[in-house]
Amino acid sequence: MKKKLNLCPKGTYDFFGQGAKIFIDVRKVFFNQAKKFNFSYIETPIFEYANIFLTTNQIADIVSKELYKFFDKSGRELALRPEGTAPIMRSVAQHKLFQTEKKFFYFGPMFRYENPQKGRFRQFYQAGFEIINYKKDSLEFQILEIILLIKSIFKDLGINEYELKINFLSNLTTRNIYEKNLAQYFEKFSDKLEPISKIRIKKNPLRILDDKIEQEKEFVKLAPKINTFWTMEDKNIFNRITSILEEFKISYKVDYNLVRGLDYYDDFVFEFIDTSQTLGTKLALVGGGCYNNLPTKFGLNNFKSIGMAFGIERLIEILKSKKNIKEQNLDFFLLSFTDKEILLNFKLAKILRKENFLVDLNKTPFSVSKGFQLAKKSGAKFVFFFEKNQAKNYISLKNLQTGKNEQILYTEINFEYLNSIIKASENA
């Protein structure tokens, strides 16, 4: 059966119209916030050598089931990146960017072969922030900066319905002891587990806690909790973290079943969950945590790191549902009825655009009635046009909302006045 040429692949989408506008606005917020918090932008390839992901997330679903792998013409095994942290760590090791603490920010597409549904796609965008090679005794302050950054981004986006969940997974030694106990516990209930979870008992029992179906089962809710395995040092660290969150009046909920979908997370982990019901279910808008073991895969020892990533499509879905989204309409449409007027309006457009006004114009002469129809369809607030018997060096300016018409000196445009009428029309 032939595939239709006019369909995009399953799990992908096209950005246009309101979605494209929101995407651009969201991206702008992230770049502005990254600058405010002094994060440097980093861009890694969309595809990497597959072993970067295979060795850092051996039993994670995104590698075992969802990784887009392929061989190039030279027989090298490559993969489309499913997440952004491992490629950044590869870049840090390759370019020796580890002499001092570094703060990186990225924004780009990721790829996972998963079942598409609301808020989940096979090609999707993530915005991520990573703080690498920080001093061990500064953990709670690194966490505070990450959380404050997230809240600042949400504020800029106008998103205020969310819940912060936190957990502490301890170090590798404690976590291994916990996982053995967890596996023994789930063995008793193996007949009640989903097929994939039966495999996870031996490979990665923590993922059973994170499974949406398993989470609803009573015996999973009653499974051993990580905090009962904490050392005294773990308890002290966790208390310092919660104390500083409370100091800054940051609401949080401790969820001892919270784990992350990537294997390399340890110590502190967190998620901000959407509570608006826009996405239909309580999906994570952003999640992250510490990944002190990941750098060792790249030959970087004693290398403390923390990071997080936002799901951009989920943010866009929430913003689409809000009633107060303003379209970015044109400021001026320059209407021409003759070829000579088109040339004059191109010169005017150049001047107006230089002053940062949003401008468009017709490049084919129109009749008066069709021309004004076009101007209204453009969404412009005002239209410039030349009238018959127009006074020399003047052009007419019409307010398309009120119908008010006035004469403007073409040779000496008063930009202050134009700015004032644009602002007045926006507040009307």
From Swiss-Prot:
A single GO molecular-function term is:
histidine-tRNA ligase activity
Query: The organism sits in which domain of life?
Result: Bacteria
InterPro entries recorded for this chain? aa-tRNA-synth_II, aa-tRNA-synth_II/BPL/LPL, Anticodon-bd_dom_sf, His-tRNA-ligase, HisRS-like_core, HisRS/HisZ
Single GO cellular component term: cytoplasm
Q: What is its EC number?
A: 6.1.1.21
Primary localization: cytoplasm
PROSITE patterns in the record, alphabetically? AA_TRNA_LIGASE_II
Please give the Gene3D superfamilies that the UniProt record associates with this protein. Anticodon-binding domain, Bira Bifunctional Protein, Domain 2
Which Gene Ontology terms describe the biological processes this protein takes part in?
Answer: histidyl-tRNA aminoacylation
Record's keyword terms, sorted:
Aminoacyl-tRNA synthetase, ATP-binding, Cytoplasm, Ligase, Nucleotide-binding, Protein biosynthesis
Q: Show the catalytic activity.
A: tRNA(His) + L-histidine + ATP = L-histidyl-tRNA(His) + AMP + diphosphate + H(+)
EC top class named in words: ligase
Tagged with keyword Chaperone: no
Subcellular location field: Cytoplasm
Describe the subunit structure.
Homodimer.
Give the similarity note. Answer: Belongs to the class-II aminoacyl-tRNA synthetase family.
What PANTHER family does this protein's entry cite?
Answer: HISTIDINE--TRNA LIGASE, MITOCHONDRIAL-RELATED, HISTIDYL-TRNA SYNTHETASE
The record's listing under NCBIfam families reads: hisS
What name does UniProt use for this protein?
Answer: Histidine--tRNA ligase
Organism this protein belongs to: Mesomycoplasma hyopneumoniae (strain J / ATCC 25934 / NCTC 10110) (Mycoplasma hyopneumoniae)
